[in-house]
Amino acid sequence: MKKKSKLINQERSITWVNLGIALASIHYGLGFLVGSGEAIYTNGPRGILYALSTAIGLLAMVIIAPFYWTNRDPIWKLMGRYYGNSVEKIVAALSGVWMFGVIASQILGGASSLAIFGLGKIPSLVGITALICLLSLIDMGKLTKIFFYMLITSSAVLLLSLLQIGIHWVPTSLNSLLSTPLKGPSVLEEASGVLLTTVLLTVMGMDFHQFLVKARTKRDSILGPLFGGGILILLSILLLSLIYGSIKNGDTAGITDPRQVIPVILLRFGQSVLPGLGILLALPVVLVSVGSGSGVNKIVAKTILDLKLLPKHIGYKRVVISSGIFTLLLSLLGKSIIDLIVSFYAIYVGSVFVPFIVYLRDKTAKNKPASQTTVKQALVVSTISTALVFLLTLFSNAIPYRPLLILGAGFCSSLIVFAMSKIAPKLHA
C-alpha cells in the first residue's frame, strides 16, 4: 500500500503554473488561431467567441477539478465501474468521436494555408490529408515538440504583427466586441451553442483530465485551470485585436478564403521585414496542421482498436487511412473550422452529459441509483439522436445554430429515457 501511495505521489508532480500552461496548450492550436481568424473575418468581433469559450471552459473546470483529482480515472472508467462494461465502452468510444472534428479542422487550416502558395483547393486538402495519414503511421518521437515550437514561434510573430499595426487596436477591438449586439437571425442561438458546447467539452474532455489528475496537490488542480483560463483570455484578446486591426487597415484585402487570414498576416509581416521571410513564417502553419492532425489521428485509431469495435483483421493502418478519408470528406463540405469542431464536440457532450450528471448524483445521493440498463439505454438513444441531427443538418449552411440543436437532441432524449425509467421501471430493470 505504501508503494502504491509513493507511486501516485511521483505521478502527481505538476505545479499549478505548468498545469495551466498544459491545459491552455490543448485548446491553443489551429482551430483557435485559424478558426478564429476565419470567424472574425466573416462575423466581425463576435467571431472570437469560440476562443473566449475555451477560456471560460478552463475556468469552469474549477468546479469539478477536486472530483477528478481525487478519483483519477477517466469518465468512462468511473461510469463503467458503476454501470458495467457496456457503458464504459460506449462512453470511451464517444470520447474519441469529437476528435474527428479536430482532425478535419487541421486539414482545413493546413490546406487553406498551403493554398496561398498557389496550390489549388482540392490538391491542398488531399495533400494535407495524405501527410497526416503518413505521419500517423510512423513514430515521430521528438518531432512533436518541434511542431509545438513552430506554433509558439508563429504566435510570437503574430504578437509582433500586432505591435507593428499598433497596440491601440486592443481597446478599439474590445470596444467593438462589447458594443456588438447579439441580435439577428439565429445569432443568439449560435452563440449559445458555441459557448455551452465548448465549455462542457472542456469540463468533460479527457485530454484535459489527463493533466489535471497529475497536479501536485488538490490546490494545484484548482489554480491550474484558473491560470490556463487567464492565458487563453489574454491570447483571445490579442488575437481579436490583431485580426480586427488588420482587417480595418486593409491588410487582408483580396482574401477569397477567410481561413487564410492568419497565414496571410504572417506572410505579409515577414515580407515587410525581409523579402522571402514571409514564406518561412507562413509555412509553419501548414506543418503544425500536419503534426497536430497526425497526433490526434493516432489517438482516434488507438481508441477504436483498444475498444475492439472492429473485426480483428482490420489493423491500425486501415483505421488510420479510413479516419483520414472520413475527415477529408468532412473538410470538403465547405463548413467553417469552428462549426466542424463544435458540432463534433456537441455529439459527445449531448450524448454523455446527462448520464454523467446522473452518475454524479448516484455516487453521492442516498436514493436508489439508476439501473445499468437505463444508463446504457440513455447513452444509446442520445447517441443516435445527436448523430441523426448532425447528419440531417450537415449539408445545410443555413443552420448556424447546429451545435445547439445537437445538444438539445442529446439532452432531451437522455432525459426522456430516465423519466420513462421512473414511470415504467419494469422496462428498465
Positions of PLM-derived features:
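Membrane-interface "cap" regions at the ends of multi-pass membrane proteins
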Residues: 1-34, 141, 160-161, 185, ...
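Extracellular/periplasmic helix-exit of transmembrane alpha-helices
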Residues: 224-265
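Hydrophobic alpha-helical segments and their helix-loop junctions in multi-pass secondary transporters
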Residues: 103, 107, 111, 116-126, ...
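Select transmembrane alpha-helical segments in multipass membrane proteins
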Residues: 14-23, 52-56, 85-98, 182-193, ...
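A generic transmembrane alpha-helix motif of multi-pass inner-membrane proteins
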Residues: 1, 373-429
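Extracellular loop-to-transmembrane helix junctions
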Residues: 1, 10-14, 38-77, 230-233
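Transmembrane helix-loop boundary segments of multi-pass membrane transporters
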Residues: 38-51, 80, 107-124, 141-150, ...
